[in-house]
Amino acid sequence: MIKDNDNSKVALITGTSSNLGINIAYRLLEQLPSSTNVTLIVTSRTLPKVKEVITNINQYSKTKLNRTGQLEFDYLLVDFTDMVSVLSAYYDLNKKFKKIDYLFVNAAQGVYSGIDWVAATKEICRNPMEGVTNPTYKTQRVGVKSNDNMGLVFQANVFGPYYLIHKIKHLLQKGGRIIWISSLMSNPKYLSFNDLQLLKSPESYEGSKRLVDLMHFGTFKQLQSEYGIEQYLVQPGIFTSFSFFKFLNVFTYYSMLMLFYLARLFGSPSHNISGFIAANAPVTCALGNESQSVKVCSVSNRTGKEYLSYQEVDTTGSADISAYLEKLCHEWDLTLKDQIVNTRQP
C-alpha cells in the first residue's frame, strides 16, 4: 500500500465504468504531477466491471503516460440505491484509508424505458440544435422506488452519494475536494418541491440533477468552514454515454453522432462528444482554483478544442433541500445503527 504522505493522493470515483468516470481517471492521472503516488478507488455494482475498468486504466497509464509515481487500485462494490450497500462502502473506506483527497460523485442512473422515435423525429426536424441539446423524447418510467422505499433515481443520484459523504467527512476534512457532476438538463422546471423524491416526475433524471445543484449551494459553505472541504459543481456537457447504447442500433447511433458533430460545427459549445473533453471541468476543479459559487462547465469550440465556461445557478430553495437531506441522514443513521456489512461480497 502507498504510504500516506505529501506526495500521495487518494481519489474515489463513483461510476468509474461509465464513459465519464473512466475519463475522469485518465485525466486525473495525466494532470497530476507524474511523480505523485496515486491510489484510485474504483466503484461499480459488479466485480467484473471493476476488474475491466482497472485493467483499462492501468493499460492507459502504462501506454499513454510517462508516470514515475506509483499507481495502486482499490475498489468498492456499491449500489447507491441500497442503503446497506452505501453503509458497507463507508465501513470499507473508514477501515482502509486515513484520508481521501478527491471524491468525484459521478452518479447518473435513470429509469429510461426508451426513445419516442416519432417525437424525436419531429423535434429534430423542427429545431435540430434544440433537439440534440435539450431532448424531451427520451422516455422515463414514473414512480419507481428502491427496495429502501425511496424514489430510485433520487436515491441513486442524490441521497445515496450524499449519505456516503455524510459518513466520510472525517476522511475528506482539511483539504479534500468533492466534485458533484450535474447536467446541462438541470433546469428548475424539472423539480417540484412537493415531490422531492421525484416519484411523480416524468423527468426524474433531470430533476435529480436540479436537486444536486440546490444541494451544492445549500452545503458548500458549511463544508468549507466546518471541515475544510472544498465542494464543486460541474457540468460535463453532451458526450457519448455507454448507458444509452441499448436503445440505439448502428444506424441510429451514427445518426446521433453525426448530429452531435453538426451541432458543434454550427456553434454549440456543449457538444463535447468525447468523454475526455467532458472530464475537463471535474478534473480542473479537483486540481485547480475554480469558484465554488458557480457551475463549472466542460465546453468545446467548433473544432473540438476544449475550454471551460461558468454558469450562474438559480439557488432558490437550496437551504430547504440541504435541510431535507440532513433530516434523511439522521433518519438513516438511526435505521442503520446496528447494521454490520461486508462490501467485498460480489
From Swiss-Prot:
GO terms for cellular component: endoplasmic reticulum membrane; lipid droplet; mitochondrial outer membrane. GO terms for biological process: ergosterol biosynthetic process. NADP(+) binds at L20, T43, K49, Y205, K209, S241. Pathway: Steroid biosynthesis; zymosterol biosynthesis; zymosterol from lanosterol: step 5/6. It comes from the Eukaryota. GO terms for molecular function: 3-beta-hydroxysteroid 3-dehydrogenase (NADP+) activity. The active site is at S182 (proton donor), Y205 (proton donor), K209 (lowers pka of active site tyr). Signal peptide: none annotated. Pfam families: adh_short. Keywords: Lipid biosynthesis, Lipid metabolism, NADP, Oxidoreductase, Steroid biosynthesis. Its EC number is 1.1.1.270. It catalyses: a 3beta-hydroxysteroid + NADP(+) = a 3-oxosteroid + NADPH + H(+). InterPro entries: Ergosterol_Biosynth_ERG27 (IPR051593), NAD(P)-bd_dom_sf (IPR036291), SDR_fam (IPR002347). Belongs to the short-chain dehydrogenases/reductases (SDR) family. ERG27 subfamily. This is 3-keto-steroid reductase. The lineage of its organism: Eukaryota, Fungi, Dikarya, Ascomycota, Saccharomycotina. The gene is ERG27.
